[in-house]
Amino acid sequence: MAKSKDIRIAITLECTSCSENDEKRFSGVSRYVSEKNRRNTPTRLELKKFCPYCYKHKIHREIKK
């Protein structure tokens, strides 16, 4: 019997510092696409990723689609 594919979903991660302040060299918001397992991580995912607009590693938070 095959397992259900509904557990693993695609999510979008957005930079928290880019969306809050406008004092950057370039305008834009850094976004990453990833997958998460709903059973293991029911809450919103937060990862530290590189932001090309801030030129630093910043916290990227899961957003609603």
UniProtKB/Swiss-Prot annotation:
Its main location: plastid. Belongs to the bacterial ribosomal protein bL33 family. The keyword Lipid metabolism does not apply. GO terms for biological process: translation. Keywords: Chloroplast, Plastid, Ribonucleoprotein, Ribosomal protein. It is found in: Plastid, Chloroplast. HAMAP family: Ribosomal_bL33. GO terms for molecular function: structural constituent of ribosome. This is Large ribosomal subunit protein bL33c. Gene3D superfamilies: Ribosomal protein L33. Pfam families: Ribosomal_L33 (PF00471). One of its GO terms (cellular component) is ribonucleoprotein complex.
